[in-house]
Amino acid sequence: MAFIAKSFYDLSAISLDGEKVDFNTFRGRAVLIENVASLUGTTTRDFTQLNELQCRFPRRLVVLGFPCNQFGHQENCQNEEILNSLKYVRPGGGYQPTFTLVQKCEVNGQNEHPVFAYLKDKLPYPYDDPFSLMTDPKLIIWSPVRRSDVAWNFEKFLIGPEGEPFRRYSRTFPTINIEPDIKRLLKVAI
């Protein structure tokens, strides 16, 4: 079992450009973490909505995308290819993320990123679909398999401004529909 951090603020990641992303710098801001893939059927929708949320809360929300290739091999780009894939292929049209993308990682199994070990421990299933599981066992390419595993691309985790994991959302929950929860956490009038 992966090491589980004691606090959200003890975690970190490495951005696509190789810089350390220290979660301790996120104190006082809500954080939205989403496992992403550039070749998924919902890539355009979800990446566009991630940009929208980051633009709506530029100083009070941190959006982090974690590319992962564990679901249908839909993020088969190398780290240095991901931004060009997003810009020219899907979503395409010159798309550029307004949020931070970190280096490709695993979100399930023995080599899961410590961020996901922590988040799945605190939020073991999506609130909108508590029975969400990988539907086709032939697609499971990691071990060990756990009930709390991320089921597919674009699962989302929302963390409050005090570093407390607030809610996990399934892949079918539209990213933009998280906005009321972000406002609630930031105490913004809805």
UniProtKB/Swiss-Prot annotation:
One of its GO terms (cellular component) is cytosol. The keyword Zinc does not apply. The keyword Oxidoreductase applies. It comes from the Eukaryota. Its EC number is 1.11.1.9, 1.11.1.12. It is an enzyme of class 1 (oxidoreductase). Its main location: cytoplasm. GO terms for molecular function: electron transfer activity; glutathione peroxidase activity; phospholipid-hydroperoxide glutathione peroxidase activity. Keywords: Cytoplasm, Oxidoreductase, Peroxidase, Selenocysteine. The active site is at U40. Homotetramer. Catalyzes the reduction of hydroperoxides in a glutathione-dependent manner thus regulating cellular redox homeostasis. Can reduce small soluble hydroperoxides such as H2O2, cumene hydroperoxide and tert-butyl hydroperoxide, as well as several fatty acid-derived hydroperoxides. Cannot reduce phosphatidycholine hydroperoxide. PANTHER family: GLUTATHIONE PEROXIDASE, GLUTATHIONE PEROXIDASE 2. This is Glutathione peroxidase 2. It comes from Homo sapiens (Human). The lineage of its organism: Eukaryota, Metazoa, Chordata, Craniata, Vertebrata. The gene is GPX2.
